[in-house]
Amino acid sequence: MEKSALVYVGLTVVTVFLGIFVKNTEFVPRYIRGGGRYGESRCATRQQAANRAASFGVYCLLAGVSACRIAVGNDYWVYRDNFKLIAQNRHVSSEIGFNFIVKLFQDLFGYDNYLPIFAFFSLVTVFFYVRALEDQGSYYAFSLFLLMTGGYYFNSLNSVRYYLALAVALFSMKYVLRGEYEKFVLWVLAGAFIHKSILLVIPVYLAARFLASARLKKWHYILGGGFLCSLIFCQGLYREIIFFFYPYYRNSVFDNGHLSYVNILKCVCVLILCAICYKRSLGEDVMNRFYFFLNLFGLVVYCCGSFIPEVSRVGYYMIISQIFLLPRLLAQMEKGWLRRLAYAGVAGAFGMYFILLLREMYAVDIRLLPYLNWIFN
């Protein structure tokens, strides 16, 4: 493994260590119920100050590594070429909001000055990730560990537009949980100016929130079964809807009918853990139930949505909620050997996934390693 991989390993270790100093267990439930982010008191307590300081440190490290990169990612130079086309007012397939920002930055910093553009999107993407952890991460350090080892941060060095939209979607979950649906829709619409795929989360997150607070009846299961059947028998209709928004995906390399077995396995394992913890953690806990239904939706998409181009990206909008659900389930389990085994299993599985991810980062279609930055390279 190349030495620059130690940058990613060290970043994960140091940020998770900083995350240990963030104690959010009491603040998150209050915030989701409508309270302040760090409690009700306007005068910061010592713990609130520690939370802010540690979280700011996490942000600086994550943003720094991302913003200072150069030639990292298989689409880095593709984006650079698109930046030039945008500055020339040529047609590109990216959304109007993204194009506006790119053109503005080149007007300010000069034609083909691409480093500030990548840095800006890095700073914004990491901001939404960290704010989501602050607002919803009852167990901040563990959620951060899952975010890092699950690849959501490192993959944001690729596919800049998509991962910014994913970070906005993660951030916007809190508004669904708080019942502030207008804010949720506005944030999603803002994200759609960067990547239209985020529009998917409006019906998906609202459906998960409805089911989380409802007592399931027979008609819920009938509707669910009907939707499942539609994914099997109405694939042509769904494909036409997708190609209306993304016509260049038709018959492209992304339209390959690929099944993501790793993500299917992740969803199945999470749902098994949910079944084990149902009485203690899912019965009346709306947050946990919301995340549970998102993972259930993700499993359905991965199992029945192979006709969707880039199906993994569609599913990520749902299964990224695992970074909040798993720590809550594990913490609420009764102390004993089963809890210790579950902690070890989750940490070990994500750790192994991270190791495999590091090995794959050298692949031509990923190219996240070697890590280069414009300061030293």
Locations of the language-model features?
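Membrane-interface alpha helices of multi-pass inner-membrane proteins
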Residues: 152, 183-207, 299-303
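Membrane-interface transmembrane helices that cradle and orient dolichyl/undecaprenyl
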Residues: 169-182
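Alpha-helical transmembrane segments and terminal signal-anchor/GPI-anchor hydrophobic tails
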Residues: 72, 77-80, 92, 99, ...
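Short acidic/glycine- and proline-prone juxtamembrane loop motifs at membrane-interface regions
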Residues: 157-163
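Short hydrophobic/aromatic helix or loop-helix immediately within or flanking a transmembrane segment
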Residues: 77-111
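Membrane-interfacial, low-structure loops and terminal tails that flank and connect transmembrane helices
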Residues: 27-51
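Loop-to-helix entry region of an early transmembrane alpha helix in multi-pass inner-membrane enzymes
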Residues: 96, 110-124
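Transmembrane-helix signature of polytopic, membrane-embedded enzymes
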Residues: 130-149
